[in-house]
């Protein structure tokens, strides 16, 4: 391991990134947010947060007081899942471990929001079949890719277009998952409606070919996401709910900028959120994946969509906005983005490799390189063994 080469850090301590901001009921002391980072360390069976390492992992990254952490995506129910080593928030056994994590983050005087996750067609159909569960999506006549279609057929678990009753059941499970999270001590929840997972599959005209009230128009495609928003606001309060969107994302076979109506689709969602805000139910934040990163599996600078911007959201939605996507190596871009006083910045991959990232951003210190090979590996290595800047100096990284 070593510092990133060919990168000139810039101190950002004099920017709005280091001005306090209130998100929901939380008084953040800076605006560098840890976005959801799937790490595949949960225990199987049971999708239980890792008993040996998870508390340490989150504690390390909560070390700067006043930091907002959004957890790795957590499945709201067994049916929502399909990955053995991602955590859930439906069982007592899971919540025991989450409570330890939440307490550890709060002991560092930081804040924690749980990302609520439903996979849809991105799930492994064979895992679902093994557990007697459906392989769900918005439609059953268009597939994520040929490989997923073949896997589903081989597992005798063909892609299933959700019925209206099944949509209602998912909404109930979202509510229960949100209640479980808050009861265990979380500060709030983020609804994952981005990156090609189930709610995004309903938003996108490529994956949603329905002809009922959940498809066929901008309003109908947004219905499921907005019903989840309304149900959670009712259940736990608007100030404890945020929403993640990725208008230009192409991960998991979404349309991104290739869809001519994509801005109209997301402008409608933003408008509906602002309408609710004006009625006294403003969400804590909207979280946007930037077109700078259309696919999280690509290296920094690859797959950038240059034909559009998320700036349109600001003219509609008047609450806080978290922007995530390839910012760590571009402090000059961050300096511009945070001139807007409603903006927070999500730092993902470099929060994995730099547990003290906030200090480094403030002072303009070198950044630890990350090791992509350990992102999803069931090991403590690459999870809880990245050094702080001071530790890296003791290891002689500045001489490498």
UniProtKB/Swiss-Prot annotation:
Pfam families: Oxidored_FMN. It catalyses: A + NADPH + H(+) = AH2 + NADP(+). Keywords: Flavoprotein, FMN, NADP, Oxidoreductase. Transmembrane segments: none annotated. It is an enzyme of class 1 (oxidoreductase). Its cofactor is FMN. FMN binds at residues 38, 115, 244, 349. Flavin-dependent enoate reductase that catalyzes the chemo- and stereoslective hydrogenation of electron-poor alkenes. The enzyme is reduced by NADPH, and oxygen, quinones, and alpha,beta-unsaturated aldehydes and ketones can act as electron acceptors to complete catalytic turnover. The physiological oxidant remains elusive. This is NADPH dehydrogenase 1. It comes from Saccharomyces pastorianus (Lager yeast).
């Amino acid at each position: 391991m070593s510092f990133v080469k060919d990168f000139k850090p810039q101190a950002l301590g004099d920017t709005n990134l280091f001005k306090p901001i209130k998100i929901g009921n939380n008084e953040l002391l800076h605006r560098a947010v840890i976005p959801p980072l799937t790490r595949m360390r949960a225990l199987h069976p049971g999708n239980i947060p890792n008993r040996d390492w998870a508390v340490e992992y989150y504690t390390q990254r909560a070390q700067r007081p006043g930091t907002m952490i959004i957890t790795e995506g957590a499945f709201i129910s067994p049916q929502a899942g399909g990955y053995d080593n991602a955590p859930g928030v439906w069982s007592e056994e899971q919540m025991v471990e989450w409570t330890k994590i939440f307490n550890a983050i709060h002991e560092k005087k930081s804040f924690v929001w749980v990302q609520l996750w439903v996979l849809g067609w991105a799930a492994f159909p064979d895992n679902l079949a093994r557990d007697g569960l459906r392989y769900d999506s918005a439609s059953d006549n268009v597939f994520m890719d040929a490989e997923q279609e073949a896997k589903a057929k081989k597992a005798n678990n063909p892609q299933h277009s959700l019925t209206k009753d099944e949509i209602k059941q998912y909404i109930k499970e979202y509510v229960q998952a949100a209640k479980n999270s808050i009861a265990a001590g979380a500060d709030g929840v983020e609804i994952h409606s981005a990156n090609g997972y189930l709610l995004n599959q309903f938003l996108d005209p490529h994956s949603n070919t329905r002809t009922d009230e959940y498809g066929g128009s901008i309003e109908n495609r947004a219905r499921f996401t907005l019903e989840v928003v309304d149900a959670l606001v009712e259940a736990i309060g608007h100030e404890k709910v945020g929403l993640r969107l990725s208008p230009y994302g192409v991960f998991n076979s979404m349309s991104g900028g290739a869809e001519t109506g994509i801005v109209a689709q997301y402008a409608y969602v933003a408008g509906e959120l602002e309408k609710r805000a004006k009625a006294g139910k403003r969400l804590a934040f909207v979280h946007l994946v930037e077109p700078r990163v259309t696919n999280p599996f690509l290296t920094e600078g690859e797959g950038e969509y240059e034909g559009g911007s998320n700036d349109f959201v600001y003219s509609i939605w008047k609450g806080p906005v978290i922007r995530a996507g390839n910012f760590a190596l571009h402090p000059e871009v961050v300096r511009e983005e945070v001139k807007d006083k409603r903006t927070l910045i999500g730092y993902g991959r470099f929060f994995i490799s730099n547990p003290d990232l906030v200090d480094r951003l403030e002072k303009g210190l070198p950044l630890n390189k990350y090791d992509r090979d350990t992102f999803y590996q069931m090991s403590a290595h690459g999870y809880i063994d990245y050094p702080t800047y001071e530790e890296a100096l003791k290891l002689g990284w500045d001489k490498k």
